[in-house]
Each structure stands twice: as C-alpha cells, then as structure tokens.
Amino acid sequence: MSIGGGVVWANNCTDEYAHMSFDESAGEYLDYTSSRLKEDTSCGYIKGIESSNGYSFNATLVGVDETGYCEDFELIDYDVNPGDEIWMYNYVKENGYNYAAVKCESNTGDDYSVGFLWSPDSV
C-alpha cells in the first residue's frame, strides 16, 4: 500500500501593491486596479497596508474582459482596514472571466488614500 500527498498551489497568487486616492467632493470615490490573469476558482487575496486617515475602504473582486470591468454576477464586498488580511470569495472564473481586478470604493466623504496588496488567486 502506498500513501501520497502533495500541495496544490493556485496559479496567480503573487501579491501586487496598489494605491488608490479618494475625494468624494470631486466625484472620485471609486477606482479599479489594473487587471490580472485569474487562473482558477480560488479566493482572491487582499491585505490592507496603509490609509492616510485610518479609514477603511470597500473592495470587491470583479471580472475583466475586452469591454472593461464586469459586474454582471453576484459580487461580494469586503471592508478593508490597514492590517486586514482577507481571502476574497468571488465568482469571477465561474462566470467565464479570465481576468480580475479589485473595485475600490471610499467608505467616507473625506479625501484620503489607501495602499494594499492583492492577488486574483490564493494558495
């Protein structure tokens, strides 16, 4: 009898830094990261690094295709604070999208910026 085991790694789980600035009074309350290849149905990952005023922001993993950002399926929003590590459940790949991005929204009317790490797949 033989027993074996192994580790399965998701394909695109390298963290990439992103920075967003929000200013709701100027209509700048929403932004997206650049798109990245989403190779499997695993969770995405986000880690809050910094916020200029300590406020959180709202993050959602969305699909991306040749027409742009796609939100035509069930989306799951996450509140991200500095120091938070979140495995982002999503339905990007299940809905036929091969690329993903993080949709970021301000959680306050103030002018502030945030920095975070993210990856479209997780280990």
What are the functions of these language-model segments?
Residues 1-10:
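Sec-dependent N-terminal signal peptides of Gram-positive bacterial secreted proteins and lipoproteins
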